[in-house]
Amino acid sequence: MITKFRIDESVAQEEFGLACQRLIPWPTDADSPEDPPLGAMACFLRPGGSSQPDCHNQDEFMLILSGTGTLDLDGESTSFEKGDLLVLPRNQEHVVHNGSDDENLVWVSLYWPLREVPLS
């Protein structure tokens, strides 16, 4: 079965100081009760905006679809642009900044495991 999504800011919800459209997990049916192994969301950050600081026990990839920005990750900073793929290791605080005054920053985040594993 093919499952198709469309990235659409109009259905995004406010989370983490930006607009997020949850893509995965999707509603499961009776034939597929298991959670997928990862989560995904499209993120939209307004011009000049910054996300709230976030830290979670999940690894994350950010694929930049449009715009430019800066990622602050556990005391380190790097700039990025459309087409870049950023790797965020688990348990490291991060903040995303939109470097444009007139263009939304848009990316897709993939994170795993789907549910955070409790720290021992």
What are these regions (language model features)?
Residues M1-P37, S120:
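A short, N-terminal "cap"/entry segment at the start of jelly-roll beta-barrel domains
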Residues I24-D29, M41-H56:
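Conserved short histidine dyad/triad with adjacent acidic residue
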Residues S51-P53, L71-D72, L88, H94-D101:
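Short beta-strand His + acidic residue motifs that chelate non-heme Fe in jelly-roll/DSBH
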Residues D102-P118:
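A short hydrophobic beta-strand segment most commonly corresponding to one strand
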